[in-house]
Amino acid sequence: MPQHTELVVLLDDDGETIGTAPKATVHTRDTALHLAFSCHVFDAQGRILVTRRAIGKLTWPGVWTNSFCGHPAPDEDMREAVHRRAEQELGLELESVELVLPDFRYRATDAAGVVENEICPVFRAVAASPVDPRPEEVGEYQWVDPEQLIPAVAHTPWAFSPWLTLQLPLLYPEHAAHSGLAETAAAAAAVPAA
């Protein structure tokens, strides 16, 4: 049976689609700008689901991050991609999927030199089923109060993904300002991306 090649959508600096490329060829030291998304999932108590990326992941293995991320397929509706990836990565059904940071964009280099270079709209959603993570995607997970997550990221940013570090001050500006996270994120954003 032929193996399915996952494609990512390549973008120009204005965010316009310029083509596609196999996902396996995109995340390198010279990563092209491409389309992705992040999602922050909440439970009925208002806690956020954070996940620790599996050790086998190509980028940022073993670090804590937001609930999940992914790449929409060419011509796939972004909300459909969010639902698809929640099921693939976490065995999770979602409700109330809402776009909260439509213009989020970042570039970061991990310890192995692999670059993420994404226009990455950020969504929030509510869990509609129990979490059943796939071990090849998620090493572990926790439900945490956002007010506890923010100082943890501010004090140990190296333990978290750079996109989470950059997203939290935008999602929770009132808490980030008091925790030092705004300064941590500003410093991370100021690091040249090589």
UniProtKB/Swiss-Prot annotation:
SUPFAM superfamilies: Nudix. It is found in: Cytoplasm. Its main location: cytoplasm. Pfam families: NUDIX (PF00293). It is an enzyme of class 5 (isomerase). Mn(2+) binds at H27, H34, H71, E116, E118. Its cofactor is Mg(2+); Mn(2+). Binds 1 Mg(2+) ion per subunit. The magnesium ion binds only when substrate is bound. Binds 1 Mn(2+) ion per subunit. Belongs to the IPP isomerase type 1 family. This is Isopentenyl-diphosphate Delta-isomerase. It comes from Clavibacter michiganensis subsp. michiganensis (strain NCPPB 382).
